[in-house]
Amino acid sequence: MDAGLLGEWFDELAPIGADPSGGVTRLAYTPEEDGMFEKVASFAARLGFVTAEDCAGNMHISFPGGEDAPCHTIGSHLDSVPRGGMYDGVAGVLAGLLVMEKVRRLRLSISVKTVAFRCEESSLFGLATAGSGVVTGSIGIHDLERAKSASGQSLGEAMKKKGYNPGTCRLGGIIDFTELHIEQGRVLWESGEKIGVVTAIAAPTRLKATFLGRQDHSGATPMDLRKDALCAAAEVILAAERAGRSEMGFATVATTGVIRVTPGALNVIPGAAELGIDVRGIDKESVARAVAAIREAILTAEGSRGVRCGIEVTSASDPVTLNEDVIESLAAASEKCGLAWRRMASGAGHDAMKIAPLFPSGMVFIPCREGISHSPAEEASLEDVALGAEVMLEGIKIRRETA
């Protein structure tokens, strides 16, 4: 695989959404995400490939004349979190292009294409894997209208504003699907292994918890007469952490990543608060227990603090087990390439989890420096991306031989 070509691509993409304080911001359906798609389309054109958009704005990269043929498909996403890293998602799309470039250069008789998905991150609209979810039918129009940015724009509106018509197409023509991704954890980095063959993907359950107390003067209101919404929320934040810790044996985690306080003034007792809580794991029952513990904590806070509380599940999906034939082929490919590897589960969600219920799917993880991701400090080596691409291509060859 041509790591030098990969480096040129990353260099050209680097200015898009570059944040002066570090990292890149390429949120879904913004000009920055558009810029990523346009630039990657130009890479494909230079190699002689053709591109097409679907009803959600996902980009399909094919060999000329092979647009409608069943293909071994590689893909990931091009959007980012605010001040995120260069490699999250992007490495997987460019690895797909790298595989296609080698197939073309060596004139291999393999039908392969690459898909770049829109809106994998939930940062702007609170709904993850939207591009892949729309074209697989797991995310509907109602879901898109419920998902809104802080400005009040729905995800459906954002899609339509770009000229897309979600709900009018379905993903097809896929023999199997493979996604390369940085691990976003420290396992491979600390073990020194080059490849993680993913067996299952954890699924997130997202909760919105609301707390309505009484807004009062912070100096004139005695401590025993307060109905502090933020204090009630704080109890739930710690309860969520305890819930995650109690399920560590099942690899379940719980995170409070969003806190909104009203009015948010130093001399005012908070009258209202809202939390965004993320619970995820590969064991459905374990996730359910953690969510139940958080619900119980909310009821307890409501009773003890005289604050009205509510909880809403904003999104939920089941953990996904990946295809054993694809897993075995990627394991065999790693051995064939002489690489140290391991089987592992993914704690983060990925587009592959939307594809897996419909088509045989697998994932390849590569290390990222110190396990850091969703951060300006995110880093992976070009050589590791190229090695991962080589494993995907060898996996395709193995599956073709054993089909």
Where are the language model's segments positioned?
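Acidic/His- and Gly-rich active-site-bordering loop/insert found
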Residues: A3-G84, V103
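Zn-dependent metallopeptidase/amidohydrolase metal-coordination segment
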Residues: L6-D19, H72-S76, A340-V391, I396
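A short beta-alpha structural unit
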Residues: R26-A28, T255-G264, G276-I282, R308-I327, ...
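Flexible, glycine/charged-enriched surface loops at secondary-structure junctions
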Residues: A52-D54, S111, P166-R170, A220, ...
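Alpha-helical metal-binding/catalytic segments enriched in His/Glu/Asp
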Residues: I74, R83-S122, T205-F211, H217, ...
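Acidic, glycine-rich active-site loops and adjacent beta-strand->loop/helix elements
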Residues: L78-S80, V115-S123, Q184, Q215, ...
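Midchain, well-structured core segments that form catalytic/ion-binding scaffolds
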Residues: C119-E120, G126-E285
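His/Asp/Glu-rich mid-to-C-terminal helical/loop segments that flank catalytic regions of hydrolases
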Residues: I201, H217, T221-S246, S286, ...
